[in-house]
Amino acid sequence: AGTLTKLDLPIEVKEKSRFVSRAGEKLASILEAHPIPVRDKVCIDVGASTGGFTDCLLQKGARQVFAVDVGYGQLDMNLRNDPRVVAMERTNARQLTLDQLMEASPHARQIDLLVMDVSFISIQKILEPLHKELKEITHWVLLFKPQFEVGRKFIGRGGLVRSQEAVEEALNHFGSW
Protein backbone atom coordinates (compact mmCIF):
# COMPACT_ATOMS: atom_id res chain seq x y z
CA ALA A 1 0.00 0.00 0.00
CA GLY A 2 1.14 3.52 -0.61
CA THR A 3 0.46 7.00 0.68
CA LEU A 4 0.88 10.27 -1.20
CA THR A 5 3.04 12.79 0.65
CA LYS A 6 4.61 16.16 -0.03
CA LEU A 7 8.10 16.00 -1.53
CA ASP A 8 9.70 17.93 1.34
CA LEU A 9 8.14 15.79 4.09
CA PRO A 10 10.76 13.81 6.05
CA ILE A 11 10.29 10.04 5.79
CA GLU A 12 11.99 7.44 7.94
CA VAL A 13 11.80 3.67 8.26
CA LYS A 14 10.92 2.67 11.82
CA GLU A 15 12.35 -0.81 11.59
CA LYS A 16 13.73 -3.05 8.90
CA SER A 17 11.83 -6.25 8.24
CA ARG A 18 13.55 -9.46 9.34
CA PHE A 19 12.53 -11.25 6.15
CA VAL A 20 12.32 -10.55 2.42
CA SER A 21 8.51 -10.47 2.67
CA ARG A 22 5.74 -10.44 5.27
CA ALA A 23 5.23 -14.15 4.66
CA GLY A 24 8.37 -14.74 6.71
CA GLU A 25 6.69 -13.11 9.71
CA LYS A 26 3.69 -15.42 9.30
CA LEU A 27 5.85 -18.54 9.30
CA ALA A 28 8.01 -17.26 12.17
CA SER A 29 4.91 -16.83 14.35
CA ILE A 30 3.73 -20.35 13.48
CA LEU A 31 7.13 -21.83 14.32
CA GLU A 32 7.20 -19.92 17.61
CA ALA A 33 3.75 -21.25 18.57
CA HIS A 34 4.47 -24.80 17.40
CA PRO A 35 8.04 -25.97 18.02
CA ILE A 36 8.66 -27.72 14.71
CA PRO A 37 12.35 -28.54 14.24
CA VAL A 38 13.99 -26.56 11.44
CA ARG A 39 17.72 -26.50 12.31
CA ASP A 40 19.73 -28.74 9.95
CA LYS A 41 16.53 -29.87 8.18
CA VAL A 42 15.93 -30.10 4.45
CA CYS A 43 12.72 -28.23 3.63
CA ILE A 44 10.46 -27.50 0.70
CA ASP A 45 8.63 -24.17 0.32
CA VAL A 46 5.64 -24.57 -2.02
CA GLY A 47 4.46 -21.22 -3.38
CA ALA A 48 7.80 -19.60 -2.58
CA SER A 49 7.14 -16.39 -4.54
CA THR A 50 9.52 -13.74 -3.13
CA GLY A 51 10.84 -16.20 -0.57
CA GLY A 52 9.51 -15.05 2.80
CA PHE A 53 9.02 -18.62 4.06
CA THR A 54 12.35 -19.68 2.54
CA ASP A 55 14.12 -16.78 4.25
CA CYS A 56 12.51 -17.64 7.60
CA LEU A 57 13.54 -21.31 7.29
CA LEU A 58 17.13 -20.35 6.50
CA GLN A 59 17.26 -17.94 9.44
CA LYS A 60 15.98 -20.76 11.65
CA GLY A 61 18.91 -22.91 10.50
CA ALA A 62 17.53 -25.04 7.66
CA ARG A 63 20.27 -26.93 5.82
CA GLN A 64 18.58 -26.62 2.44
CA VAL A 65 15.30 -25.25 1.07
CA PHE A 66 13.66 -26.18 -2.23
CA ALA A 67 11.84 -22.97 -3.24
CA VAL A 68 9.05 -24.13 -5.56
CA ASP A 69 6.81 -21.73 -7.45
CA VAL A 70 4.80 -21.81 -10.66
CA GLY A 71 5.91 -18.23 -11.32
CA TYR A 72 9.28 -16.96 -12.48
CA GLY A 73 11.63 -14.18 -11.44
CA GLN A 74 9.96 -13.45 -8.10
CA LEU A 75 12.48 -15.05 -5.73
CA ASP A 76 14.64 -12.50 -3.92
CA MET A 77 18.09 -12.28 -5.53
CA ASN A 78 19.95 -12.89 -2.26
CA LEU A 79 17.96 -16.10 -1.75
CA ARG A 80 18.42 -17.12 -5.38
CA ASN A 81 22.19 -16.80 -4.91
CA ASP A 82 22.26 -18.62 -1.55
CA PRO A 83 23.81 -22.09 -2.02
CA ARG A 84 21.31 -23.52 0.48
CA VAL A 85 18.39 -22.58 -1.79
CA VAL A 86 17.31 -24.71 -4.73
CA ALA A 87 15.12 -22.42 -6.84
CA MET A 88 12.52 -24.43 -8.75
CA GLU A 89 10.61 -21.80 -10.69
CA ARG A 90 8.03 -22.49 -13.40
CA THR A 91 7.24 -25.64 -11.44
CA ASN A 92 3.64 -26.71 -10.89
CA ALA A 93 3.58 -28.30 -7.43
CA ARG A 94 0.70 -30.57 -8.49
CA GLN A 95 3.05 -32.24 -10.94
CA LEU A 96 6.20 -32.17 -8.80
CA THR A 97 7.94 -35.53 -8.42
CA LEU A 98 10.64 -36.83 -6.12
CA ASP A 99 12.71 -37.52 -9.25
CA GLN A 100 12.58 -33.81 -10.18
CA LEU A 101 13.68 -32.88 -6.68
CA MET A 102 16.48 -35.48 -6.78
CA GLU A 103 17.69 -34.02 -10.08
CA ALA A 104 17.90 -30.63 -8.41
CA SER A 105 19.66 -31.89 -5.25
CA PRO A 106 20.61 -35.24 -3.72
CA HIS A 107 19.23 -33.99 -0.39
CA ALA A 108 15.65 -34.35 -1.69
CA ARG A 109 15.20 -37.74 0.00
CA GLN A 110 15.85 -36.02 3.33
CA ILE A 111 13.03 -33.46 3.08
CA ASP A 112 11.45 -33.39 6.52
CA LEU A 113 9.42 -30.16 6.49
CA LEU A 114 7.03 -28.81 3.86
CA VAL A 115 5.66 -25.28 4.13
CA MET A 116 3.00 -23.97 1.76
CA ASP A 117 1.57 -20.53 1.05
CA VAL A 118 -0.28 -20.56 -2.28
CA SER A 119 -2.90 -18.33 -3.84
CA PHE A 120 -5.61 -18.69 -6.47
CA ILE A 121 -5.85 -22.45 -5.92
CA SER A 122 -7.14 -24.71 -3.17
CA ILE A 123 -4.33 -26.24 -1.13
CA GLN A 124 -6.15 -29.57 -1.36
CA LYS A 125 -5.59 -29.66 -5.13
CA ILE A 126 -1.87 -29.41 -4.48
CA LEU A 127 -1.72 -31.54 -1.34
CA GLU A 128 -3.21 -34.72 -2.77
CA PRO A 129 -0.59 -35.28 -5.49
CA LEU A 130 2.23 -33.91 -3.32
CA HIS A 131 1.39 -36.19 -0.41
CA LYS A 132 1.41 -39.23 -2.71
CA GLU A 133 4.82 -38.24 -4.04
CA LEU A 134 6.39 -37.02 -0.78
CA LYS A 135 4.67 -39.14 1.86
CA GLU A 136 7.86 -39.47 3.96
CA ILE A 137 7.73 -35.81 5.03
CA THR A 138 7.16 -35.56 8.78
CA HIS A 139 5.97 -31.96 9.18
CA TRP A 140 3.53 -30.03 6.96
CA VAL A 141 2.81 -26.33 7.63
CA LEU A 142 0.03 -25.02 5.39
CA LEU A 143 -1.55 -21.59 5.14
CA PHE A 144 -5.31 -22.12 4.83
CA LYS A 145 -6.76 -19.20 2.85
CA PRO A 146 -10.57 -19.32 2.98
CA GLN A 147 -11.07 -17.29 -0.20
CA PHE A 148 -9.43 -20.10 -2.19
CA GLU A 149 -11.12 -22.96 -0.32
CA VAL A 150 -14.84 -22.09 -0.07
CA GLY A 151 -15.79 -21.93 -3.76
CA ARG A 152 -16.71 -18.95 -5.94
CA LYS A 153 -20.35 -18.79 -4.88
CA PHE A 154 -19.26 -17.63 -1.40
CA ILE A 155 -16.90 -14.91 -2.61
CA GLY A 156 -18.10 -11.32 -2.63
CA ARG A 157 -16.65 -8.09 -3.96
CA GLY A 158 -12.95 -7.64 -3.47
CA GLY A 159 -12.43 -11.38 -3.00
CA LEU A 160 -13.87 -11.41 0.52
CA VAL A 161 -15.66 -14.50 1.79
CA ARG A 162 -19.32 -13.68 2.54
CA SER A 163 -20.12 -16.67 4.74
CA GLN A 164 -18.37 -17.64 7.97
CA GLU A 165 -20.35 -20.87 7.80
CA ALA A 166 -18.74 -21.68 4.43
CA VAL A 167 -15.30 -21.03 5.94
CA GLU A 168 -15.99 -23.38 8.85
CA GLU A 169 -17.35 -26.04 6.49
CA ALA A 170 -14.27 -25.79 4.24
CA LEU A 171 -11.97 -25.99 7.26
CA ASN A 172 -13.83 -29.02 8.62
CA HIS A 173 -13.70 -30.69 5.20
CA PHE A 174 -9.98 -30.00 5.02
CA GLY A 175 -9.46 -31.30 8.56
CA SER A 176 -11.17 -34.57 7.69
CA TRP A 177 -8.96 -35.05 4.65
Q: What role is predicted for each listed range?
A:
Residues 167-177:
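Short alpha-helix
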Residues 44, 64-66:
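Conserved beta-strand positions in the Rossmann-like core of class I SAM-dependent methyltransferases
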Residues 1-37:
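S4-like RNA-binding module at protein N-termini
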Residues 66-125:
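S-adenosyl-L-methionine
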Residues 146-163:
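Short, glycine-/aromatic-enriched active-site segment of Class I SAM-dependent methyltransferases
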Residues 39-49:
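Conserved class I S-adenosyl-L-methionine
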Residues 124-144:
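A short glycine-rich, Lys/Arg-flanked "PGG" loop and its adjoining helix->strand segment in the class I
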